[in-house]
Amino acid sequence: EGYEAQTKREHDELVGTAELLRAKGYRMDVLSGGNSYSARCCKYLEGITEVRCGNYIFNDVATLATGFAVEQECALRAVSTVVCKMDDHHAIIDAGSKTLTTDLCGHRPGYGWVVGHPEIRITKLNEEHGFVESDEPLPFEIGDKIAIIPNHACVLPNLVDKIYGIRNGRIERMIPIEARGRYL
């Protein structure tokens, strides 16, 4: 099922359920729904008063792996340093579960997407380190920086005090995360 069909089905189920409840006398001033995919299918939002468009602002490995987004549309990236290279096919980076989270994506193995290198897998995490593998020789050395698209973009901004807006390889602005670690 494509994301447009999924969005329509979810909309129809939500609005249909609300109509059944209203017919029984229940009052609903707010009908809240939506997800990352519905942000591109606004025609299926009629009747919904509050749209929750998921991580559409960032995208992540889930939206990338399902074809909803391409790599260039994934705005959130964690920058990590290669700290150890055991051989041509295995390395350790300084981004672990505290950065990338242990959330898995059912659409592809591993704990993130190395930008520009979809063949590389982050196979294991401890708190401060990630373990990287590739069937091909790894294209980086100790000290190199790599950008990683997280499996689940919602978690990473909650773990940091600020993120940087980068355009054309230059930092354009620093964005403070005022709700960091809070449940509002």
Question: Where are these predicted regions, by residue range?
Answer:
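Generic, ordered loop/turn and secondary-structure boundary motif
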Residues: 57-59, 65, 79, 101, ...
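Short coil-to-beta-strand transition motifs
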Residues: 72-79
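C-terminal accessory subdomain/extension
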Residues: 86-184
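Active-site loop/helix belt of alpha/beta enzymes
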Residues: 1-70
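Conserved hydrophobic positions within beta-strands
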Residues: 82-83
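A residue-level signal for beta-strand positions that form part of recognition/binding surfaces
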Residues: 48-50, 79, 90, 129
